[in-house]
Amino acid sequence: MAMLSFERKYRVRGGTLIGGDLFDFWVGPFYVGFFGVAGFFFALLGVLLIVWGATIGPNAELQTYNIWQISIAPPDLSYGLGMAPMTEGGLWQIITICAIGAFVSWALREVEICRKLGIGFHIPFAFAFAIGAYLVLVVVRPILMGAWGHGFPYGILSHLDWVSNVGYQFLHFHYNPAHMLAITFFFTNCLALSMHGSLILSVTNPQKGEEVKTSEHENTFFRDIVGYSIGALAIHRLGLFLALSAVFWSAVCIVISGPFWTRGWPEWWNWWLELPLW
């Protein structure tokens, strides 16, 4: 892939966290770095272990290469927080380590790229929230509940079954107040950024013979429709806040389900019915 005209001046030494100049190079447009190598290693090992797990299966009947049916299940609850045999959940434990290694390596690679460019660490900071949500699901919550078996299985359909089953364990998971906040932030984020994206497209794609519109048109549109324009920079701050809030409350909603609340979530709202106001 050809290098863009402005890229060469940014391909400078330094900014690395580990390894010095050893891995300080690019492969095509991709910066490698120590964490690029580490991330590739963990990702490749994890994928190969999933393929191996699909090959051996927990039993002969469940050996499959159907991508929809492949499932690497966590250990049985009886193993607690100990290591399980490879075919009884140990594979899931090792793949989890690989996933964590790959995700963290990717984030640290982003840090190195930011250091090279002299820009802020907003991108790795945002990605860290996604990593944190994953850690809550496969590390924090299982530890709080006393068994790795409370983690979710690695499989397309099997992990959807896990989500459904956990929801039914708490009757109506949508009554979880943190889940409500997470969904609210998800939808609000979609609304805000879709409105922003459509506005930019509308002013930068004029009809034939017309000029490209300016930020004055953008601000005027939103002042006309909702009475306020947040501005070009602030809409991105708002989008980041909404996205990170959605991820944060998603992690909260699952980590409190089980370790801190064991009954159906509709019961949590009894305090509302017992208010003296009624």
UniProtKB/Swiss-Prot annotation:
GO terms for molecular function: bacteriochlorophyll binding; electron transporter, transferring electrons within the cyclic electron transport pathway of photosynthesis activity; metal ion binding. Signal peptide: none annotated. It comes from Allochromatium vinosum (strain ATCC 17899 / DSM 180 / NBRC 103801 / NCIMB 10441 / D). PROSITE patterns: REACTION_CENTER. Belongs to the reaction center PufL/M/PsbA/D family. GO terms for cellular component: plasma membrane light-harvesting complex; plasma membrane-derived chromatophore membrane. Keywords: Bacteriochlorophyll, Chlorophyll, Chromophore, Electron transport, Iron, Magnesium, Membrane, Metal-binding, Photosynthesis, Reaction center, Transmembrane, Transmembrane helix, Transport. The lineage of its organism: Bacteria, Pseudomonadati, Pseudomonadota, Gammaproteobacteria, Chromatiales. Fe cation binds at H196, H236. InterPro entries: Photo_II_D1/D2_sf (IPR036854), Photo_RC_L (IPR005871), Photo_RC_L/M (IPR000484), Photo_RC_L/M_CS (IPR055265). GO terms for biological process: photosynthetic electron transport in photosystem II. This is Reaction center protein L chain. A ubiquinone binds at F222.
